[in-house]
Curated annotation (Swiss-Prot):
Residues 1-30 are annotated as: Disordered. Its cofactor is Mg(2+). It comes from Shouchella clausii (strain KSM-K16) (Alkalihalobacillus clausii). This is Holliday junction resolvase RecU. The gene is recU. It catalyses: Endonucleolytic cleavage at a junction such as a reciprocal single-stranded crossover between two homologous DNA duplexes (Holliday junction). One of its GO terms (cellular component) is cytoplasm. The record marks K104 as: Transition state stabilizer. Binds 1 Mg(2+) ion per subunit. It is found in: Cytoplasm. The lineage of its organism: Bacteria, Bacillati, Bacillota, Bacilli, Bacillales. It is an enzyme of class 3 (hydrolase).
């Protein structure tokens, strides 16, 4: 059964969990060669195994186009399309708080294009923030493999002022955001950054 993205391109299944990975270059421990989402998925599995957090990627909705019924009691999907996700990529619970975030990667060296964020995602971030959830975006600059956590309020401010600038300078992300430690286990340790930004370091209570 062919499954396609909203633009009509065929869906290619990513390697199954457990398959051997290509060795990383000797000069880095970060997930070069892996997508940002793959690194986050691996980090989330690590956090779950260590009983630190429960965070999952939200499933992408699928629109079924063609269904055959070879048997009265069975249906076979012949054609389907991925629909555009209505919210952000990930959500879960950490230290008793609801967290919700988007993951974006850019090949630009000096800025992050705001066109990578969709209006419905910004609307969702507004609502999560308004109701007290921890909401942010993880941005990876592909060329340098640097990952930054930017709180939703800063992203929303820039998004609402696109008549002034269509992107966020990397220097602004460095100033307003927080660089996330990368390594082996986990490949992207964003919980460490959450501790520093939202939980006053090792404090029990949120700041």
């Amino acid at each position: 059964m062919p499954i396609r993205y909203p633009n009509g391109q065929p869906y290619s299944r990513s390697p199954k969990q457990g398959q051997a990975k290509k060795p990383l270059p000797a000069d880095t421990y970060s997930g070069r060669g892996m997508t940002l989402e793959q690194d986050i998925d691996e980090a989330n599995l690590y956090y779950l195994s260590q009983q630190r957090a429960v965070v999952h990627k939200k499933p992408t909705p699928v629109q079924i186009v063609k269904v055959d019924y070879p048997k009265r009691s069975a249906a076979v999907i012949r054609e389907a399309y991925f629909k555009q996700a209505s919210t952000t990529d990930y959500n879960g619970v950490y230290r008793g708080a609801y967290i919700d975030f988007e993951a974006k990667e850019t090949k630009n060296k000096t800025s992050f294009p705001l066109k990578n964020i969709h209006p419905h995602q910004v609307d969702h971030m507004r609502e999560v923030s308004k109701h007290g959830g921890i909401c942010f975006v993880l941005i990876r600059f592909f060329q340098s493999a640097e990952v930054f956590l930017l709180d939703a309020k800063h992203l929303i401010d820039y998004y609402d002022n696109q008549d002034v600038r269509k992107s966020i300078k990397k220097t602004e992300i460095e100033r307003l955001g927080h660089q996330v430690k990368t390594g082996l286990h986990p490949p992207i340790d964003y919980l460490r950054t959450l501790d520093a930004v939202y939980f006053n370091g090792d404090a029990k209570e949120r700041t």
